[in-house]
Amino acid sequence: MLNVKEIFEYLPHRYPFLLVDRVTEFKSGESLKAYKNVTYNEPQFTGHFPDNPIMPGVMIIEAMAQCTGILAFKTQDVKPDGTSMYYLAAVDNCRFRKPAIPGDKLEFEVKTVNNKKGIWKFECTTSVDGKLIASCDMLCAERKV
């Protein structure tokens, strides 16, 4: 549905911090599905951990947050023009059930819980091979840049 070049239109993130490879499904105001292919060539694996590479949990959270930004902007049918962006405001009930490693395809699903005055609440999950590896509730706030 959205390839990486199209994702650039909704997120300010670029290498090495763009953590969404493709959006596969979008339901306006409701949900978004996307994925990221984890590869050993990514810079975080030089230190986390060279002999046992594991995707840092905070990067999985960030990837889910990037998905929420795409969902919010697309729901409003707005492409950011540099005057506002969505900031991660809170993460609650975060759980990591299994580590993500190089070779995994992280499958994200973010669902809108509510939106009031530019503050969005989402339920977020990450799965690998259909098995849940991470979940959280997230608040994102639209702010002027």
From Swiss-Prot:
Annotated compartments: Cytoplasm
The keyword Cell membrane belongs to this UniProt entry's keyword annotation: no
Class of the enzyme per the UniProt entry, highest EC level: lyase
One Gene Ontology cellular component: membrane
Gene3D superfamilies: Hotdog Thioesterase
Sorted UniProt keywords: Cytoplasm, Lipid A biosynthesis, Lipid biosynthesis, Lipid metabolism, Lyase
UniProt record, GO biological process: fatty acid biosynthetic process; lipid A biosynthetic process
Chief location: cytoplasm
Recorded catalytic activity of this chain's protein: a (3R)-hydroxyacyl-[ACP] = a (2E)-enoyl-[ACP] + H2O
Protein task: Involved in unsaturated fatty acids biosynthesis. Catalyzes the dehydration of short chain beta-hydroxyacyl-ACPs and long chain saturated and unsaturated beta-hydroxyacyl-ACPs.
Name recorded for this polypeptide: 3-hydroxyacyl-[acyl-carrier-protein] dehydratase FabZ
Organism of this sequence: Hydrogenovibrio crunogenus (strain DSM 25203 / XCL-2)
Gene giving rise to this polypeptide: fabZ
